[in-house]
Amino acid sequence: MYKRQAYTGEEILRMLDFTLAQFKSRGFGVPKTFCAGFYTTSLELQNKIALKGFTSSAAAFPPGKEVGSQYSPSWHELAGWDTSVTIRSVPYRISKTTILPTGTLPFIQTVDGNPLVEIPQNCKIDWMVTAEDMKMIINHHVQFAKKGRSTAVCLAIHEGSADRYFTKFNDVLEYVDDLSENRNAQVKVRYATVSQVRAKFIEHWK
């Protein structure tokens, strides 16, 4: 029988320090977004990335079967994700008591004095969904926006999968291009970095 044992806070800090040192040695600044495998995420990790200068996380993942393929339950159960994370999830502030979107005050604070924000991988990841699945998820969020709800879609694409799934990704991105270029659309669809999405949501929450 195996016993699950998470990384300690000290171990997490050592790994983060190593990662940040690699960025610094190559002349880059401090990265702002941390994407942990959703199954390795924990409150300990979220607190430590906030301490080290990260302002956003991209780990929340829909465990359900509503759209596309599904990981085995053990993957999301390791971290504590549940069906409160769906393809309809939107960015949220991370609570000090849970990594789930159901969390409430107090929130984990970052070095800029604002909350650590989770950007859910609401479009699942590259191999799990078809182009039509991804377009359908995008359309859900467009409808949210038409009702006045702030939202964002995270297209999670692994660098190593870009060539293998090029046709699918190209189809989806062309679809997004068409939405963003439609001057008569009821809502504006635009590409944005995680930092830009976080800034807009913080402004919205205020």
Feature-to-residue mapping (PLM):
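Short amphipathic alpha-helical segments and helix-helix/interface helices
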Residues: 20, 46-47, 173, 177
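C-terminal domain-boundary segment and adjacent tail
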Residues: 56, 61, 131-206
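Active-site-adjacent pocket scaffolds in enzyme catalytic domains
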Residues: 35-149
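Metal-dependent polysaccharide deacetylase catalytic core of the NodB/CE4 family, i.e.
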Residues: 3-43, 60-69, 73, 123, ...
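Glutamate identity and glutamate-enriched acidic tracts
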Residues: 10-11, 44, 66, 77, ...
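A structural motif corresponding to the C-terminal end of an alpha-helix
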Residues: 18-29, 107-116, 147-148, 179-187
